[in-house]
Design a protein with these regions (language model features):
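Conserved phosphate-donor/acceptor-positioning beta-strand/loop module used by diverse small-molecule
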Residues: 349-372
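Short, flexible, mixed-charge acidic loops at enzyme active sites
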Residues: 290-297, 371-379
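Alpha-helical solenoid repeat scaffolds of the TPR/TPR-like class and their adjacent stem/linker regions
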Residues: 1-330
Length: 495
């Protein structure tokens, strides 16, 4: 590739940038492709497409695009910062820090790079260095709510709960109560108040964070979707559905509700010397979206699956294995994908990989639902439209249970149920069960998962960086008087 970059912002690139700002990553990618077809040296198109692919979870492809952008413009701080963000997503702390430091050496007053570096250092437990990054942003520029929010979160994770509440109150007082930063800050404030045992105030803060969202969550539509998967993959028809000839044991899928303990399970398995924890890969979700076109079906998922052929399953299985191998530099025997949405696709995944194993993580429904309600999930994303109301969270909990019980009835040898509370109570016993389920020999490193140098990005990162703890068990009890609609939504579930 020639070294001279094309840096003009074309109309197509302007449209791509607008689509990216609106989180319409697929449209942005198509527009970037249009730019690159017109001029292969368009550094901005390579860069933006790399950012879109990062946001979409296609990390290896994203890295290739960002590296192409760097070939064209080697000392561009914004590209280096994007590469740093990609490495953070992959859990590669050292590579991320290198890229971000390079960006800041080239442009010391680069707030976006300082912000990413601060968040990275926080996740690494280097709280004082992280604080300096955030404060440097505020000293070099006017009030930036993202830096102020990061300071509040830093105080919380450092155990300075009163300071976290104070920082959150200061930020919320100067931001619009409908803004994303206000809502995210309210969740931090609530969690800090919870640690201070000010439970009513904590619940009030979480309600502020969840208030007045106009989401499109439709419980009837959600239940109908579950029904559709259970119909296509009914017990009397599933044996007649085609399967690929792929006999690989490499893909492993962890599924469950958000905040159910899936990150802990992933970290335990990832500490095994023959297991790679790949994080929340979106490859299968993206594949599922494309299947109707690949099958040339007018029906959407899952109805289109009645028309799929074994040769297409072979193709997509091999392609996905190649994507896993691109991440699997250490040639591990198992690669774990913990994208929670995969509970929809257990049937598809079994067709692709008839030998693959699944782990379904379950948690006490009251603890699980409260944990979802008390954390920020973007409710404008389809996956999380239910997270702003306790009754909706309870409803989805029951639907996930219903669908996973169906998959388990169909594939009892392939799906292991892990109870979060049992894992806390006897980590070695439950960890041995999981390792045995994957067909591997026991590795005592699984009990030392908190010593891993892999970066954890999910909301659970502060918890899984230390040994097993039980403070998250029965967390709902001080909030019992606030959980009436949740109890009604959960129906028969025991506490």
């Amino acid at each position: 590739m020639a070294q001279r970059p094309f840096t003009k912002v074309t109309p197509a690139l302007q449209q791509a940038m607008q689509a990216f700002s609106q989180n319409d990553h697929l449209r942005a990618i198509h527009l970037c492709d249009t730019c690159l077809q017109a001029n292969l040296h368009d550094v901005n198109a390579w860069h933006l497409k790399g950012r879109c692919l990062t946001a979409g979870g296609l990390y290896d492809l994203a890295r290739k695009h960002l590296k192409n952008a760097l070939v064209l413009k080697p000392n561009e701080p914004s590209i280096l910062a994007s590469l740093g963000r990609l490495e953070i997503e992959l859990g590669n702390a050292e590579a991320a820090l290198t890229a971000l430091n390079q960006a800041l050496q080239l442009q010391p007053s680069f707030p976006e790079a300082s912000l990413e570096k601060g968040k990275l250092l926080e996740r690494m437990g280097e709280y004082e260095s992280a604080r300096k990054c955030f404060e440097s942003i505020n000293s070099a520029s006017p009030f930036r709510d993202d830096a102020e929010y990061s300071l509040a979160q830093l105080h919380f994770h450092a155990g300075a709960f009163s300071e976290a509440v104070e920082q959150a109150e200061k930020l919320m007082a100067r931001t619009d109560d409908q803004s994303t930063v206000y809502r995210k800050t309210a969740f931090v404030q609530g969690r800090a108040l919870d640690k201070l045992k000010k439970f009513d105030q904590a619940m009030a803060a979480w309600k502020k964070g969840n208030a007045n969202f106009q989401t499109n969550f439709d419980p009837n539509e959600y239940a109908s979707r579950v029904d559709a998967y259970m119909k296509v993959y009914a017990e009397e028809t599933v044996q007649n559905l085609p399967r690929s000839s792929c006999q690989s044991l490499k893909p492993v899928f962890i599924v469950g509700m958000p905040r159910s303990g899936t990150t802990l399970v992933e970290q335990i398995l990832g500490a095994h010397n023959q297991v790679l924890s790949a994080g929340e890969l979106r490859h299968i979700e993206i594949l599922a979206q494309s299947l109707p076109d690949l099958i040339q079906s007018k029906s959407s998922m899952p109805d289109c699956m009645t028309g799929i052929q074994a040769d297409l399953l072979d193709q997509v299985a091999i392609r996905h294995l190649k994507e896993l191998e691109d991440l699997n530099q250490d040639q591990c025997l198992r690669v774990v994908n913990k994208s929670l949405e995969n509970y929809w696709f257990v049937g598809l995944l079994h067709q692709m990989y008839p030998m693959a194993k699944f782990i379904f993580v379950r948690r006490n429904p009251f603890d699980n639902a409260l944990s979802v309600f008390s954390n920020w999930f973007n409710p404008h994303k389809y996956s999380y439209t239910y997270t702003t109301e306790l009754k909706s969270i309870g409803f989805v909990y029951r639907q996930v249970e219903r669908l996973m019980q169906h998959w388990t009835n169909l594939l009892p040898e392939h799906i292991l149920h892990v109870e979060y509370e049992a894992l806390l109570g006897d980590p070695e016993r439950e960890s041995r069960k999981m390792v045995d389920h994957l067909g591997l020999e026991w590795d005592p490193n699984c009990l030392q998962f908190h010593k891993s140098d892999r970066l954890v990005l999910t909301l659970s990162y502060a918890q899984v960086n230390r040994p097993i703890y039980r403070s998250s068990q029965d967390r709902w009890k001080p909030y019992e008087k606030h959980l009436g609609e949740l109890e009604e939504a959960l129906g028969h579930h025991d506490r």
